[in-house]
Amino acid sequence: GAVQASANTGYLANAASSVNITLPTVPQIGDWVKVTGLGSGGWNILQNAGQRIGVSGLPGGLAVNWAASPIVGSWTGLASSSAGDRLVAVSASGELYTSANAGGNWSPRLIGQTWSSVASSSDGLKILAAVNGGSLYWSPDGGNSWLNDGTGRAWTAVASSADGNRLVATAYLGQIWTSSDGGLSWTARESNRAWRAVASSSDGRVLVAVTNGAQLYVSTDYGVSWTARANGQFWWSAAVSADGKTMFATVDTGAIWASTDFGTTWEPRTTNRDWRGVATSADGRWVVAATSGGTLSQSTDGGNTWRATADTGAWTAVASTADGSRYIAGKSGAAVYTGQRVLYTTTGATGGVSGGQNDALQLQYVGGGVFMPISYVSANLQFGVR
């Protein structure tokens, strides 16, 4: 059946087939509509022209839509500005690309180096990139001009503070190197280890560096001193929240491990897989991790629960905006993908939300064509979002 909803009215969908309920055509701010599924057919909320529904707080409403970019490479490192407008992608096959419009267009910058990692400041203008067996390269202007340090180390990973001044780089079977002046000078830290990856808090004070086959190490003094944490694993990648309190680290043929106490204690949060890159929002709530030969996985609750996103492939690296609404992810030998988190239904008559038997949803009109959920019961794990 089909019903045109009236404002401030509740509806019981009691049929063997889905009941279509269209939102009020001229709602006033504060008006509400409630739908409860009694029958086995469930319900389907339809929208009018110019209307949409906020779904960020609904089960099933936090999916990420992925789209392939035209650039192809063996992607080893990705970086995103806080807003997601400026992106950097580096490949072991020799490419370094930048984008200034959220991946709409890509510009080749430095070609022919075996790139291993890249990091950027929060505005995306200051870029630090590493070459495995070569130098560290940095750009102050979004990739238009570059300097390098002239070294020839087995650089594996780099990380940057939000302002781009405090930098850290790891060398495989070498040391950890830190800079407090945007890369002009570097100081060797810690011992020679099989360093695999490194991540930084926004101020550069809290750092985590992971090793291939041994423990991971945490610093809370800008990299001056390091403390061994967790246990020996084949660690692959790491990510840190802006304040440094929440950390994630992936293990090759292991789990994703998490810490919520500045890296002091760690616990596994996932099943064992061939985990690769991991990225987190600034607050540590939104997390995306890559697997080699599987899908990307995402968490919307700080790593407590995970579900698949994107398709299957040899995913390698991933980066996130500060708010966790947009992502960039790379497949080895394939494309770079941009991801957009679904925060609203599609505007207009093609969008809407559906539920099943025993599902209930109450929406309130907040203006501008937007209805927001104020209560729900999700008996079927998640709602359908269009």
What are these regions (language model features)?
Residues 93-96, 133-135, 173-175, 213-215, ...:
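Loop/turn residues immediately N-terminal
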Residues 342-386:
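Extracellular jelly-roll beta-sandwich "head" domains, especially the C-terminal globular C1q domain
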Residues 80-81, 98-100, 121, 139-140, ...:
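Conserved Ser/Thr-centered positions that define the repeating blades of beta-propeller domains
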